[in-house]
Amino acid sequence: MWLRLAALAALAVVPCAMAQDVPPQTVLTLDDAIARVAAQHPDLRLADGQQAVLTAEAQRDALRPPLRVGAEIENVFGSGPTRALDQAELTVTLASVLERGGKLDARRTLAQARIDALAPQRAIARLDVLADVARRYLTITAARQRHTIALETLAQRQRTVSAARQRLQAGASPESVLLTAQALQARAELDRDRAQLEVATARRQLALLWGARSIEADQISGDALQLPAIPEFEVLAQLLDSTPELARLNNEQRLRDARLQLARSQASPDLDWQVGVRRLEGNNATALVGNVSLALGSAGRAQPDIRAAQAELSLLDIERQSQALQLYATLADAHGRYRAGQLEVARMREEVLPALARADTAAERAYRAGATSYLDWAQLQAQRSDARQQQLAAAVEAQSALIEIQRLTGQPFVVTAETTP
């Protein structure tokens, strides 16, 4: 697949002296770019920080209610018999809350569901970031190939200027033809310079993804005209069942189940208890004390939260159906755009461009021999340049669709051979 383009092969036959004088050029592949972004992009590191937060919250939610120690003294520093400490009553207590209804287990389940929900979120973020890397890498490759087309067009215009000058010197053509050819050559030079600037801008945009100002590599591997074979739409549609977007909804169901369980546990009131020892100084005696309390109406107060949790859970099926339809429609659109671009690129490579190349050669011979006009040759050159631009545009559209297909399915489609017409 486009996302897995192989690196450019090094030249095998090079004189030894030249190999010593010229340092080898470094090549940045798409896999290299992905590795750099995966190690440094903040969106991918964000999930690790979120997991640390949720783990700490899970440890907090797993704690039982604390024990409370208290002391109370009565009948001291008053008047009459309580003027001193003779009638003092000192009570030391130990108190806590007995949770009922499975609140502790419900909190633990909810905390774990939140942690588990990070996995599909991390997978979605990774696919989104890698798709962004692939798109920016594709932008570089497309700009580089537009620069190549501009160089070829410029070479054509230079040949035209040379031929027009020869015919002018021979008195077989007016000066206006030469001036027109020179103007078209200047426009071709402008297209070349603009394409070169686009390459530099695209390289900087890619480097920003891993926090760099520019790409140190000399070359960027890959060919936008490489379009691999992909399965039929029905086969790709089956892969959507395991996509991270739907996996996220499965984890969301467990999360909402846990919220419902926690809401139901609130219907059982907690039992507040307290036990202690009381010292009766006036009677020189000791006694045990204790009390329990239970909140009333907990079941009624818990009903709104229970109904809200049930409503959220029932909405999940609708959300899953909506998400599946959206993924299905996006995949269908991307698959159709890829097939159309693949067909156009192949037809241009096999039929249109070879025919225009032969026609260009024949028109050049005819013009130099005086058998055709400059206008016919110039129009043919423009058609050939436009055809190459059209082929590249179709290839870029197909590659963009292919990146979207991989983002949806998470499956690579590898190009087995490079074919650059």
Q: Can you annotate each of these PLM segments?
A:
Residues 1-7:
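Bacterial N-terminal signal peptides that target proteins for export
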Residues 14-16:
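N-terminal signal peptide c-region/cleavage motif recognized by signal peptidases
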Residues 20-151, 157-161, 172-178, 186, ...:
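Short flexible linkers and secondary-structure junctions
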Residues 21-24, 28, 193-237, 270-272, ...:
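Short, solvent-exposed, mixed-charge loop/turn linkers that connect secondary-structure elements
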Residues 35-100, 121, 210-212, 237-319, ...:
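A small-residue-enriched
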Residues 44-61, 125, 129-150, 159-161, ...:
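Amphipathic alpha-helical coiled-coil segments
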Residues 85-86, 179, 190-193, 197, ...:
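Outer-membrane beta-barrel domain signature
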Residues 125-242, 334-341, 345, 384:
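Periplasmic alpha-helical coiled-coil/stalk elements that build and connect Gram-negative outer-membrane
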